[in-house]
């Protein structure tokens, strides 16, 4: 059974930082590109970031709205993917999901950016 479990969300003030984690099980994690996606009432579902495989030198790609503020990383030995978020803005509020190429999704973790 494939499982993706996100954690690390919560309430943070504008300009603050937060790190999300996602632990995977039930598949060979190191063989899959991983993504972070977020959902909000205002913007709906929005792709955030992608990290590829070791064979691709762990190449990363980002949505324009988060470029320079968010950093995706992975640890294949822990079957985990991370999202470091800096200089958070109210518009970053949403439920953040990790996905394996959009085939499998976690339950999500809520990030609220508010004073």
Swiss-Prot record:
* PROSITE patterns in the record: IG_LIKE
Q: How is this protein annotated for GO cellular component?
A: extracellular region; immunoglobulin complex
Q: Which UniProt keywords apply?
A: Adaptive immunity, Disulfide bond, Immunity, Immunoglobulin
| Alphabetized CDD domains for the sequence | IgV_H
Single GO biological process annotation from the record: immunoglobulin mediated immune response
Where would I find the Ig-like domain in this sequence? 1-114
S-S bonds? 22-98
Q: Which domain of life is it from?
A: Eukaryota
Record-linked InterPro entries = Ig-like_dom, Ig-like_dom_sf, Ig-like_fold, Ig_sub, Ig_V-set, IgHV
One further remark on this entry is: This chain was isolated from a myeloma protein that binds inulin.
Q: Write down what this protein is called.
A: Ig heavy chain V-III region W3082
């Amino acid at each position: 059974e494939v499982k993706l479990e996100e954690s690390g969300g919560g309430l943070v003030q504008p300009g603050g930082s937060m790190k999300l984690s996602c632990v995977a099980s039930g598949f060979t994690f190191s063989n899959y590109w991983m993504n972070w996606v977020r959902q909000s009432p205002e913007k709906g579902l929005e792709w955030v970031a992608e990290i590829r495989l070791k064979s691709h030198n762990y190449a990363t790609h980002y949505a324009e709205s988060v470029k320079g503020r968010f950093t995706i990383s992975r640890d294949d030995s822990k079957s985990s993917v991370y999202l470091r978020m800096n200089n958070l803005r109210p518009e970053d509020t949403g439920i953040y999901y990790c996905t394996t190429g959009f085939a499998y999704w976690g339950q999500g973790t809520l990030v609220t950016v508010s004073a």
